[in-house]
Amino acid sequence: ETAYPNFPLPRLVFAFHADTEGKISGCRMGVIADEKPTLDTVMYRYPFSNVSGARGDICIGANALPKYKTPHALASLPTFLLSIPNGDHSFNALNNKLGMQYRDLLEHLKDKDPSYYYSDVLIPNGKTLKDFIGG
């Protein structure tokens, strides 16, 4: 298990459902264009693991999601989701232009600027931010 502190990431968006008791379900993640987001913003395939399908469903494995008592506390949920250990689960080399396998992709990207994703790594998925929000 290798830690990648300060790993560069493209612009990410998250969607989830919180019930009245603060229980979280239906976590999703997507990659958006490097611009001010609008409903027409282009979405890209997520190039890493633990995210699958056209909806961007996040696999949290055996990890339990915390409960959030206030809407403000939900701001920490993306950090929690990104801290879940990643493996090859739901990884597909076809989701990056380089065609690299997971470990090789991480090693290749660990010192790159996030702008590199947009020129050399990301593949549009044919969706917009409006599609992602609509679920």
Predicted regions and their residues:
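Domain-scale recognition of soluble eukaryotic interaction modules
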Residues: T38-G135
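Compact alpha/beta protein-protein interaction domains typified by the UBC
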Residues: E1-K69
